[in-house]
Design a protein with these regions (language model features):
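N-terminal anchoring/stem segment of glycosyltransferases
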Residues: 1-70, 175-180, 193-194, 217-221
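Short, flexible, basic/aromatic active-site loop/helix in glycosyltransferases
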Residues: 115-126
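GT-A fold catalytic core of metal-dependent nucleotide-sugar glycosyltransferases
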Residues: 57-112
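Residues that flank catalytic or metal-binding motifs in active/ligand-binding sites
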Residues: 5, 57, 75, 130-134
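A structural signal for short, well-ordered beta-strand segments and their strand-loop junctions
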Residues: 37-40, 73-76, 98-100, 137, ...
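Catalytic core and acceptor-binding pocket of nucleotide-sugar-dependent glycosyltransferases
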Residues: 126-221
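Extracellular/periplasmic catalytic domains that process cell-envelope and extracellular macromolecules
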Residues: 2-4, 92, 127-130
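A generic structural motif
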Residues: 36-44, 99-104, 160-167, 203
């Protein structure tokens, strides 16, 4: 990669099982020859409100950016690698972002306030795929990558990361099912930034033993 690139995989988690999953993930990355920085945190950030746990991804990404990293991929504690993580960073460098569709659309996972932030109506949102945030990344050396982080920050500031996990009267529209906090925020940022590089679900990542050819498995502890 270019010498101006500073790349990192980011993970954070605290509580009962998240640190154990984080350790499992780290071991798999070392075993399979990760050649990029691994910024792993297993305790709450000092400026984080622990009563709002979905904020942790924002704080972890912000810290990486403040440290000067340009190519950043977030990884959930439920993941582990079956081969080299370097494949992901190569994809990120080539495409300017790394995202995987969840199988939902944004009409299903954005409450009314989220749609206001995204400047969308629900008919428009129904045409836009939601992204997973168990794994995603952006390249800040690109215009789209910079825009993506800008919109993630805006989403954090207006409370998209704090929406209730259940329906909680988020919309009277029957298409709305539930909000997804960080997943909603990143999905809106993806579309607002003009990205068009998302992979379909269940290819790169699969539930444990569902697809032996997947780069990552996903399973809680």
């Amino acid at each position: 990669m270019d010498c101006s690139i500073k790349s990192a995989f980011v993970n954070a988690g605290f509580g009962a099982w998240y640190p154990k999953g984080s350790e499992r993930l780290e071991r798999s990355m070392i075993y399979h020859g990760c050649s990029h920085e691994m910024l792993f945190t297993r305790e709450p950030f000092a400026d984080m409100d622990t009563s709002k746990p979905y904020r942790i991804k924002y704080h972890a990404l912000k810290k990486a950016i403040e440290q000067g990293y340009t190519h950043i991929i977030w990884l959930d504690c439920s993941l582990w690698f079956t081969r080299s993580p370097n494949e992901l960073m190569d994809k990120l460098n080539h495409d300017g972002g790394f995202f995987i569709q969840s199988g939902y659309n944004l009409a299903q996972t954005c409450n009314d306030n989220d749609l206001v932030f995204g400047k969308l109506n629900r008919d428009e949102a129904e045409l836009l795929p939601e992204m997973w945030t168990c794994i995603f990344g952006f390249n800040l050396l690109t215009d789209k990558g910079q825009k993506c982080w800008h919109y993630v920050e805006q989403a954090f500031n207006v409370g998209v990361f704090d929406t209730p996990r259940d329906h909680a009267n988020g919309s009277a529209d029957p298409r709305y099912l539930h909000a997804r906090q960080d997943q909603t925020a990143v999905s809106l940022a993806y579309h607002l930034s003009g990205y068009d590089c998302a992979f379909p679900p269940n290819g790169i990542v699969a539930d444990y033993k569902d697809n032996e050819h997947s780069l990552l498995f996903r399973q809680g502890l």
